[in-house]
Amino acid sequence: MTLSDDPISPSTQESSNSSYVRSKEAEKNSPSQETDEEVLKGYESYRENPSNYDNDNILIYTDTFNLYDDMFEGSLDSTRNFGAQKDPNVLVMQRLLHNSGSLIGVDMEQDGIDLATLFADSTEDSKLPYVIYEGLEMQGEGYGTNTRGPFENKIDIGSFGKSGSVMNVEREKEKIVMIPTPRFGNATPQWTIKKKLSSYDIRPRCGRLILQSSSFNEHIGRHLPKDQMIKINVGVNVNVYDYDTGTLHELRLEYQRQYGLAHGWQEDFVRRRHLKQKDEIGLLWDFSSSRLQFGVISRNTGPGLWETKD
């Protein structure tokens, strides 16, 4: 059916309004008698003069909108009326802009109603703006936007789909609790032997770190292999790891009236670490590597010997 030709009802004047309405209903339900040739002529007329058929606004007559049903269904007749409805409400829908098959924006308004004022005065139902926002949904190209009433909506939700999902994302953001990444500091070794250096320990002529027999037997001697303990009188080589500097040194563990570390103690530790009298050091036996670990626990801030000459 073309946009300019409307089927003419019977020319006989109806005697009453009821008979006129029945004839119009019968006319609407009857199939179109237009031929293919007439339809093609209508298309050609539109193609040659499209401005005759275009307007800035489209008048749509429809009943009260349903929140979950499509708002606009059917087709416009020759007068551009959206079917025959009871008690129609006239809405003005401006043209829809499309981007890759999704609606970009829809403006709907009714005379005398201002959305901002309506929401500001909605003291009876505080959830009204939220319900309307939840009712909006995108159904793709060719569909309208559902709403509960004739409000002016200017919402751009792009191609996100249902606007309810956008609100769900916002709610999830509020639930996120930032947990700081735990930082594990370097655990200080549990020194099993602690000693404050004496003047004898730092003298170059002695060149030995003296260890008490009880401390040596409990924390070092019982962990050494038997073949090394047999040679302890003449001395056995052991690795000593400096925990503070991360360096590995080889010293000689020996027994000469007292247990002690020699052959490298003066050069690799006293001089290199600038040790002085009353500095506190720590030692422990590392089972995993079969070696000693060394560390400086505290420094003597007062006067004390660093190096003496005989």
Swiss-Prot record:
Compartment(s) where it occurs, according to its Swiss-Prot or TrEMBL record: Nucleus
UniProt cross-references to InterPro entries, sorted A to Z: B3_DNA-bd, B3_domain, DNA-bd_pseudobarrel_sf
Region annotated Disordered, chain positions: 1-39
Keyword Transcription belongs to the record: yes
Bias type Polar residues, positions: 1-21
Record GO cellular component, one term: nucleus
DNA-binding region positions on the chain: 205-300
Keywords noted in UniProt: DNA-binding, Nucleus, Transcription, Transcription regulation
Superkingdom assignment: Eukaryota
Gene Ontology MF annotations: DNA binding
Listed PANTHER family: B3 DOMAIN PROTEIN, TRANSCRIPTION FACTOR B3-DOMAIN FAMILY-RELATED
Protein name listed in UniProt: B3 domain-containing protein At4g02870
Source organism: Arabidopsis thaliana (Mouse-ear cress)
